[in-house]
Design a protein with these regions (language model features):
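Soluble catalytic domains of enzymes that build or remodel membrane lipids, polysaccharides, and related
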Residues: 1-173
């Protein structure tokens, strides 16, 4: 394996739902790849009330449990938040800050142009962006490949119905 990319939602809103975090982190740290294991945050990588896959509005500010970050460090996973790494002087890997969580945490999310402007355009640019909503902007900014998650391939009800009745494939969302 050359590179492992995890496009968000490593956690399901509750750190305590991990039965044995140390054991799971040890297992993940066993992933061997030539260039490393990288991730970006997803919209479920925060402490938030959830039931049957749906979150509920909260009055308090939604925050990321600090144990998530400690877990990733223990697991040997490098988190990229609107950050870029040049890998082996051969290509760039960009990890985006999740758009929903950036709003909740009152953080700025860079534009694709801001991210790619300082990069050497002769090298390929691979982006991990949990929510695949800005593909045209990514393409216009020189992104060659966008790796996303979030859609669950339309496998969660009622998203299955949306896919059926809209005539769109899950990738089109």
């Amino acid at each position: 394996v050359d590179l492992v990319c995890i496009a968000g939602d490593l956690f399901d809103n509750d750190y305590n739902a991990i039965k044995d975090p140390d054991e799971v982190a040890d297992i993940l740290s066993g992933i061997k790849s030539r260039y490393g294991t990288y991730a970006c945050w997803g919209n479920h990588d925060v402490s938030e009330k959830i039931l049957a896959g749906f979150t509920f509005p909260q009055k308090e500010t939604i925050v990321r449990d600090g144990r998530f970050t400690e877990f990733l460090h223990h697991a040997g996973i490098t988190m990229l938040e609107d950050e870029t790494v040049c890998i082996d002087n051969a290509f760039y890997l960009v990890g985006r800050r999740d758009k929903d969580m950036a709003k909740n945490e009152q953080l700025l999310r860079k534009t694709f142009s801001e991210i790619t402007e300082p990069l050497d355009p002769s090298l390929p640019i691979i982006v991990m962006d949990h929510q695949p909503g800005e593909l045209s902007e990514a393409s216009d900014a020189g992104v060659d490949l966008d790796l996303s998650g979030h859609t669950h391939d339309g496998q969660m009800f009622p998203a299955t119905l949306w896919s059926i009745f809209s005539g769109k494939t899950p990738a089109e969302f």
